[in-house]
Design a protein with these regions (language model features):
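Short, internal active-site loops enriched in acidic
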Residues: 15-21, 51-54, 130-132, 267-270, ...
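A generic structural signal for short coil/turn motifs at secondary-structure boundaries
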Residues: 21-23, 84-88, 154-158, 272-274, ...
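An extended, acidic, His-containing surface patch that forms the Zn2+-binding/catalytic region
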Residues: 183-393
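Acidic/histidine-rich catalytic neighborhood of metal-dependent amide-processing enzymes
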Residues: 1-67
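Extended hydrophobic secondary-structure segments that form protein cores and membrane-embedded regions
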Residues: 10-16, 46-48, 126, 261-265, ...
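Midchain, well-structured core segments that form catalytic/ion-binding scaffolds
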Residues: 37-245
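Predominant activation on well-ordered alpha-helical scaffold segments within soluble catalytic domains
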Residues: 26-29, 95-106, 381, 385-389
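Short glycine/proline-enriched loop/turn "hinge" motifs that connect secondary-structure elements
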Residues: 3-5, 64-71, 135-141, 253-256, ...
Length: 393
């Protein structure tokens, strides 16, 4: 409260569109770097005041989160082999492969990141469909699906490796099941059985691009440039559809028409921020927040956790510095830098620890969404204030 003796600076940014791919936060990152250089600021941390909620039914704890969850969108473009509906064993159904990938990855805690006992929610499908545009008795040739994949510690290259392994397992399960059912069908029908010809193949988008580049040379890059220009003519095209169209067209150029699953990342990307205390800024933020929470008098049970569990603007206060992680993201996200961009280098330079101290409510994104007034308007603001003052001591 002693403003006259206040030392330090607070940079306030009104970034009101986290739901719109965090356009506000992404635009403020380079401005923060300019301000740091102009004013010779030594930034200490980023504080967000995003909504928090109970983590399970009956949970009455209030949470302060030092760090934030990340998000990737691993996407699977699945090429099967068409068949007539009356002779289905002559083909392989991409919808069946998609279903098997969903069964393997969807809500499977094997894919959950765990750090310091905090468990990330497992992946969940956000879309799954075949790409057949009309009715016919021919089975679909292609389908695709993508997952919301949260991270606490896994980088894009690590997630790519995990989901490729999962898709390979799923693809092989489909082939094994098809052969088993085809054998039964042949036995029931009195037909001779021969093992079906399918082989499980899964590869990242980067490998598909390189294989087509070997065949077509600069023609593939011209195709991408022309396609980018054409797709950008539609300002309303969805970023995920933009990426899909590029994968579709590059695959069409490939001479190999056998079944395959192409794995790539769709936008958006939210890096996780894991505040471990490995450097002075992280250590200071952790110590400050723990001290403030411990010494704040209230009727609430307030607990410090490591990862804000919902995607937030905090993700863009830093970015992975591992070359493999960044390269995997850029080379496996079709349309990166064209339709969808991130100031990754600026995020790496900013590189700040983060904390979320927000209001408490229930039923987020429902018509019954509401706030608990006392904590939200009395306790949370005090926590924010005390955190700022103590960081600047």
């Amino acid at each position: 409260d002693d403003v006259e003796n206040f030392e330090g600076n607070i940079v306030f940014a009104a970034v009101c569109d986290e739901e719109g791919n965090s356009g506000g936060m992404l635009s403020v990152v380079p401005e923060l770097l300019k301000l740091r250089e102009k004013e010779n600021f030594d930034y200490l941390a980023v504080i967000d005041t995003d909504y928090s909620a109970p983590r399970y039914d009956g949970d009455d704890t209030r949470y302060v989160y030092v760090g934030t969850v990340g998000k990737l969108m691993p996407t699977f473009y699945i090429v099967g082999s068409e068949a007539h509906g009356g002779d289905p064993f002559k083909g392989i159904d991409p919808n069946q492969i998609a279903g098997a990938i969903t069964n393997e990855i969807n809500l499977n805690t094997k894919y959950s990141d765990i750090a310091e006992g905090e468990v990330c929610v497992p992946p969940i499908t956000l879309r799954q469909q075949d790409l057949k545009t009309e009715y016919s008795v021919q089975t679909a040739r292609t389908s695709y699906l993508y997952f919301n994949y949260g991270t606490h510690i896994s980088t894009p290259d690590q997630v790519m490796e995990k989901v490729i392994d999962g898709a390979n397992l799923a693809f092989q399960n489909v082939i094994d099941s098809l052969n088993a059912e085809y054998r039964k069908y042949c036995n029931l029908s009195g037909f001779p059985y021969e093992k079906l010809p399918w082989k499980a193949r899964v590869m990242p988008y980067e490998k598909l691009y390189n294989l087509v580049k070997e065949e077509k040379g600069e023609e593939v890059d011209k195709l991408i440039d022309d396609l980018n220009e054409k797709l950008l003519d539609d300002p309303n095209i969805d970023e995920r559809m933009f990426a899909l169209k590029i994968v579709e067209e590059i695959h069409k150029m490939w001479s190999d028409k056998d079944p395959v699953v192409i794995v790539y990342f769709s936008p958006p990307y939210y890096p996780h921020i894991y505040v471990e205390g490995k450097n002075p800024l992280e250590e200071k933020l952790l110590n400050t927040v723990n001290e403030i929470v411990e010494n704040t008098e209230s009727k609430y049970d307030i607990e410090v956790k490591k990862f804000y569990p919902y995607i937030s603007d905090l993700s863009y206060a830093a970015a992975p510095k591992e070359t493999d992680a960044v390269d995997s993201l850029k080379s496996n996200m079709p349309g990166f830098g064209v339709k969808y961009s991130l100031p990754i280098e600026e995020m790496q330079k900013l590189n700040l620890p983060v904390v979320n101290i927000g209001p408490f409510g229930k039923d987020a994104h429902k018509f019954t969404e509401r706030l608990q007034k006392d904590y939200s308007f009395n306790i949370a603001p005090k926590l924010v204030y005390d955190t700022i003052i103590n960081l600047l001591k």
